[in-house]
């Protein structure tokens, strides 16, 4: 299984509430792309604003957590890349890029493909 992962930081000056409004609109666009590209799974996460996250960050000296995380899974990488190169997917990717520029700090975010190895799944 291959997946595309986005670790997203909000733009400076954008409140968490404002980020979440953009995030909801972003979900709709990415969901269309996931469907067009025949993804088998699509998930989005937002960081919980809890004290434990601050303790973890302070004890390990890490940066602040990302504001959001997107994960899209496909069965086969080459098939996903071929589908994503099609005109309908390219058009959706362009619309997504414009939306990203509105609310994401792209220089502090990270986007990458990875191979998933499920070690434990009790769902």
Where are these regions (language model features)?
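Macromolecular interaction modules
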Residues: 1-123
